[in-house]
Structure formats: structure tokens, C-alpha cells
Curated annotation (Swiss-Prot):
Its cofactor is [4Fe-4S] cluster. This is 3-isopropylmalate dehydratase large subunit. Belongs to the aconitase/IPM isomerase family. LeuC type 1 subfamily. It comes from the Bacteria. Pathway: Amino-acid biosynthesis; L-leucine biosynthesis; L-leucine from 3-methyl-2-oxobutanoate: step 2/4. One of its GO terms (biological process) is L-leucine biosynthetic process. It catalyses: (2R,3S)-3-isopropylmalate = (2S)-2-isopropylmalate. Its EC number is 4.2.1.33.
């Protein structure tokens, strides 16, 4: 057999049959379901008098519309409340496990899956959400699907797919001070653009990737979709096994030993051929930040706002000018002088315990210097799950954030997207640890800059973007 990539191996292991048109029918091992993209799918099953084919391989959790403030009052918005209630009823009717809002395990679906050991190497994982790519951090082939596909997977536990091409991105060099997993993925998207991965599954490799914790790897894979690819993969290793061992839905005993032996066969063969390879050296990079309305609008925190006049391509210059107008920015302005109104720390990109610890380090540094969140800034920390929140509170992180002037919230997608009560007002500028900075993403007229958790805290204290490496000096 010819050398194969990790993607090739997982595809081959799950291929039921190939059609004459070149598409393949893949078996799906895990299906994550949330309240926004599942109602029509379940209703389709009802109308066709079908059942969920493998309820034990399906896990449901509400995250997009849930409130992050006092939940004893329920969900104020009627549409959001109906969506959450509908998910609960559908889960009950079809025998699917549902983690309700009062469950300590509830949270953002892409944080809950790994926490529960539902996410495993070598599996195929789908969800009606584009950031399903997060689970690729475990060496799983994971990607988002549409509502009609959600119904198809519920009914058959299979999915019709066209095989993608293979891309490998090698991230080399030791991460310098202040440079995090979020900065790595921003560097990648800044390099390849939002269409650079179109048609590919990306495998992330190299020293910098291997050095990352599992939380950091999830951050990188999470934003694969922002680089244009449908799925991202990182080869499983000892860090992967250590993270998963003992998780509620991970294999136990002899089954665990057998699973690990299989997982060790997943990494790409040494001579495997990739359709495209890219190398990015991060050794001398400062922290990064987005300036515009696309995740590819990435600059260094030491840079100035770019000028469309410096761009030769007229269409590119026009899109830059539109972004500048929307963002209310002037070319040539140092990005570290741009003032902010809001800070959001959370999301499926940066809402894990490691992210909150990194943020708390900077917040505690501010407290010791007699400082707190600037009076002109409203800042919130939203844990990615109830278990993350519980762990953070055990470590006293909530007290640090509260003392520093941050709001400490309940878990959920929150301000990552304008589908719940946490939104930006028109014209408000936000330092956000989420994954998208599109026009209106966090609220109509809201202006989003993507940064790491540490950078977000530093901006909250200063009242403007700042180089976290110099914070407090």
C-alpha cells in the first residue's frame, strides 16, 4: 500500500462505498447536536416516521442561545427559549442524551465533546456548526454540516462526501513570549488567507504544534474553517492520550489499551504525499491582532493600520477601504493606540481552563499594580462549559477576574455571535477571543478585533490595544 496521510487513513477506514460521481458514503462515529441547526432535522424524521439510527453516538447540548447571566429567570427572548425547549423535547422523543442548562456538563458543544471523551482520535465527527473542526486536535476527522445533512446523519449515521485534497502546514520555531495558540492560527490565516485552504483538509505539524497543549491544539483546529478548509487535523500523541484517559465516554480497561494501539497508527506515514505544503516560522513574531472585517486581516501588535493606497490590486484596495470605513479606523494609526469599549473572553476558540488561566495571570498582574478594567470598558469572562467554570472557581480565577473588574458569567457561546443577549451596540469596538470578525458578527454595527486571552485582558486594563509583553512594565 502506498504511504498515506492521516486524512487518507481515516477516510479509508470510514468509507462505506464510492459512487460513480466520485463521492463517497462515509460512516459517522459521533454526532454533536445543538439547538440552532437541529429543529428542522428532527421534524424531518418525524414526518418520515424515522428514528435516530444510533442515539448512543449522538450528544445534544444547547449553547448558542443560552443566557450567561442568572439562569433561574429562564431565557427572556422567546425565539431563543423555543429553540432550547425544542432541542430538549426532541432529545427526549428520540432517545438522545441531552445536557440541559442546569447540568454542570453543559457548555459550548465543541468544548463539551472533548471533556466527555465523546471526541476520540481516528473517529469521524460532525455537527451542524462550522467550528466542528475543533475536534481535529485529537486526530479526528471533524467538520460542520448543514441542517439537511444533520437529518441524514440522524437517520442513517452516514454522510455523502467528496474527498478533499491534502495540505500540511508546518509551524516551526519555539513560541516567543506572549505568542499563543491563538497567535499561531492568526499567523496561519494571515499567511494563507480565508480561501487558502479551500478544497483541502489541513494537517498541522511541526515543533510549535507539538509543543502545544491539547487546549492550544483545539484553538488552532477551531479556526481551520476561517482559513477556508473544512477540517484540520493534528496527529495524536502522548498529550492526547493523557487528556482523554479516564474521561466519561472514553474507552476503559482493555478497550483503552486497544484504542491507544490503534491511535498510534493514525499519524501520516513518513513518505506520505501532500498536495500542498506550507512552512511558517513563528520564532520571532510578536502577538497578533486583526484590524478589519475578515480573519485574514492580521497585523502585528507593533504595526500600524494598513493603507489601501499601498495595495496594487484595485479590488483588494476597495475591500480594505470598506473594512476601514466599517471599523472606523484611519490608515497609519498604530494599532496599539486604538481604544476599545468591550472585551469578550470565551467562545469555542478560547473558553477553556488554560485560556482562563492565561487571562488571569495578566489580570492578577494588574491587581498587584493597583489597576483594574478601564472605566471606559465593559469586560466579561464566559467559561466554555460548566466544568471549566467549576475548575476556574476551584482555582480562584473567578475572584481574580471580579476583583480586576470583569464580569464572571455562566457558560455558553455568548458574545461570539449575536444570537443571545450578549451583543455589541452599533459602533462599539471589542477585543474578542472568538473566531470571526465579520460585519455584525457580535451585533449590528459592532467592531470586532480577534486577539488571544492575555491580549484581551491587557486591552481591558489599558482601555486600548497594547502589547501584552510590555504590560505592567
Amino acid at each position: 500500500m502506498a504511504p498515506r496521510t492521516m486524512y487518507d487513513k481515516i477516510w479509508d477506514a470510514h468509507l462505506v462505498e464510492m459512487a460513480e460521481d466520485g463521492t463517497g458514503l462515509l460512516y459517522i462515529d459521533r454526532h454533536l447536536v445543538h439547538e440552532v441547526t437541529s429543529p428542522q432535522a428532527f421534524e424531518g424524521l418525524r414526518m418520515a416516521k424515522r428514528q435516530v439510527h444510533a442515539p448512543q453516538k449522538t450528544l445534544a447540548v444547547a449553547d448558542h442561545n443560552v443566557p450567561t447571566t442568572d439562569r433561574s429567570k429562564g431565557i427572556a427572548d422567546e425565539e431563543s427559549r423555543i429553540q432550547v425547549e425544542t432541542l430538549e423535547h426532541n432529545a427526549q422523543d428520540f432517545g438522545v442524551e441531552y445536557l440541559q442548562m442546569s447540568d454542570i456538563r453543559q457548555g459550548i458543544v465543541h468544548i463539551v465533546g472533548p471533556e466527555q471523551g465523546f471526541t476520540l482520535p481516528g473517529t469521524t465527527i460532525v455537527c451542524g456548526d462550522s467550528h466542528t473542526s475543533t475536534h481535529g486536535a485529537f486526530g479526528a476527522l471533524a467538520h460542520g454540516i448543514g441542517t439537511s445533512e444533520v437529518e441524514h446523519v440522524l437517520a442513517t449515521q452516514t454522510l455523502i462526501q467528496s474527498k478533499a485534497k491534502n495540505m500540511r502546514i508546518n509551524v516551526v520555531g519555539k513560541a516567543p513570549e506572549g505568542f499563543t495558540a491563538k497567535d499561531i492560527v492568526l499567523a496561519i490565516i494571515g499567511e494563507i488567507g480565508t480561501a487558502g485552504g479551500t478544497g483541502y483538509v489541513i494537517e498541522y505539524a511541526g515543533e510549535a504544534i507539538r509543543d502545544l497543549s491539547m487546549e492550544g491544539r483545539m484553538t488552532v483546529c477551531n479556526m481551520t474553517i476561517e482559513g477556508g478548509a473544512r477540517a484540520g487535523l493534528i496527529a495524536p500523541d502522548d498529550k492526547t492520550y493523557a487528556y482523554l484517559e479516564g474521561r466519561p465516554r472514553a474507552p476503559k480497561g482493555k478497550a483503552w489499551e486497544m484504542a491507544v494501539e490503534y491511535w498510534k497508527t493514525l499519524p501520516s506515514d513518513p513518505d506520505a504525499k501532500f498536495d500542498k505544503e506550507i512552512t511558517i516560522d513563528i520564532a520571532n513574531l510578536p502577538p497578533l491582532i486583526t484590524w478589519g472585517t475578515s480573519p485574514e486581516n492580521v497585523i502585528k501588535i507593533t504595526d500600524r493600520i494598513p493603507d489601501p493606497k499601498d495595495v496594487a490590486d484595485p479590488s483588494h484596495a476597495k475591500s480594505m477601504q470598506r473594512a476601514l470605513d466599517y471599523m472606523g479606523l484611519t490608515p497609519g494609526t498604530p494599532i496599539n493606540e486604538v481604544k476599545i469599549d468591550r472585551v469578550f473572553i470565551g467562545s469555542c476558540t478560547n473558553g477553556r481552563i488554560e485560556d482562563l488561566r492565561a487571562a488571569a495571570v495578566i489580570a492578577e498582574k494588574a491587581i498587584k499594580a493597583g489597576r483594574k478594567v478601564a472605566s471606559t470598558v465593559n469586560a466579561m469572562v464566559v467559561p466554555g462549559s460548566g466544568l471549566v467554570k467549576e475548575q476556574a472557581e476551584k482555582e480562584g480565577l473567578d475572584k481574580i477576574f471580579l476583583e480586576a473588574g470583569f464580569e464572571w458569567r455562566e457558560p455558553g457561546c455568548s458574545m461570539c455571535l449575536a444570537m443571545n443577549a450578549d451583543k455589541l451596540a452599533p459602533g462599539e469596538r471589542c477585543a474578542s477571543t472568538s473566531n470571526r470578525n465579520f460585519e455584525g458578527r457580535q451585533g449590528r454595527g459592532g467592531r470586532t478585533h480577534l486577539v488571544s486571552p492575555a491580549m484581551a485582558v491587557a486591552a481591558a486594563i489599558e482601555g486600548h490595544f497594547t502589547d501584552v509583553r510590555e504590560f505592567g512594565n
